[in-house]
Amino acid sequence: AGLQWLASWPWAVVFLPAAPLWAGVLALLGGGLLAMRLPWQLRLWSVPLLVPLLCWQAPRPAPGQFELLAPDIGQGNAVLVRTATHTLLYDAGPRFSRESDAGHRVLVPLLRALGERVDVLMLSHRDADHTGGAAAVLAQQPGAALTGSIEAEHALQGLRPATPCLAGQRWVWDGVAFEVLHPTGAEPDHPARPNTASCVLRVASAEGGPHAQAVALLVGDIEAAQEQALLARSAPVKADVLLVPHHGSKTSSSPAFLDAVQPRTALVQAGYRNRFGHPAPEVLQRYAQRQVPVVESARCGAAIWSSARPDVVECERDKGRRYWQHTVP
């Protein structure tokens, strides 16, 4: 009881962004200096050695630019969209078991390590591989607004009321334009296939400046019929990077849609050797025929893409490989 009482105090627990190695080394030196039996005038020199670790902030995109971070959350979707001062989380990954989900195991630790405050959590649709970690994220991010294609009686509505995502919704953060392209609102409240009501989000960097405009398209689990509907409405789907629809399922990535999007890079979030066979070989073949490189989370780990360098995808498995990790065949 005493420990619980102490833990309830404000600032009883403080989470700091993960600082780089050099800041940790300086902090160790500073801590050692502070602990030594030296005159206080000398021990004061430990303070500047501790400051980098205590005050570290993760680098953010420049105004007008944005970054996508697609963590390896297994069979599901979760993409962090970061601008200069704002953050949107698109989907929250799968639930692994009754006691474990992508929110607790991946997203909350990631958000803490980056020192992120999420402004908006957008859930593309109600399937558990997209909403499984949402409760944990909402608990850790009390200021995050919730939006998405989830029905009024969904359990998450009891945690935080959700605003429906609808085509035509637009906003601008730090010069970066966000636009919802789907659903239109004409879909039934309880579609037989929730995939069909997936929120499609277009994110575009600012025009002009030192970089050409770059566009990302996050499409959830839309299928060929919704892809065709977007084309029929002349929706602005052309993009530099595409989150592959429905994890690379046979039901999506129709040839006409890929021809319209013309992505430079395609990201697939799917579990290693998942039981659905995602991404399907014939779907990968469609991208290969169009010379579009496909980056799979099972092989890449966390993938990082920046509008300032739209031709480059950084793979955490390559950047931070540990000696005990094996190469995925």
Residues covered by each model-derived region:
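Conserved beta-strand hairpin/beta-sheet module of binuclear metal-dependent hydrolase folds
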Residues: P63-P109, A113, P194-E223
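Pre-active-site segment of Zn-dependent metallo-hydrolases
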Residues: T87-R126, I222-V237, G320-P329
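Divalent metal-coordination and catalytic microenvironments
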Residues: D72, V81, D91, L111, ...
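Binuclear metal-ion centers of metallo-dependent hydrolases, dominated by the metallo-beta-lactamase
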Residues: A145, S149-G175, E179, T184, ...
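Transmembrane helix-bundle segments that form internal channels/tunnels in multi-pass membrane proteins
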Residues: A1-L69, T265, R286-E296, A302-D318, ...
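Active-site-proximal loop/helix segments of hydrolase catalytic cores
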Residues: G103, L107, S124, A128, ...
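Zn-dependent metallo-beta-lactamase
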Residues: A35-L89, C165, R170-V172, A177-P188, ...
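Short internal beta-strands
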Residues: V120-M122, A144-E151, T265-A270
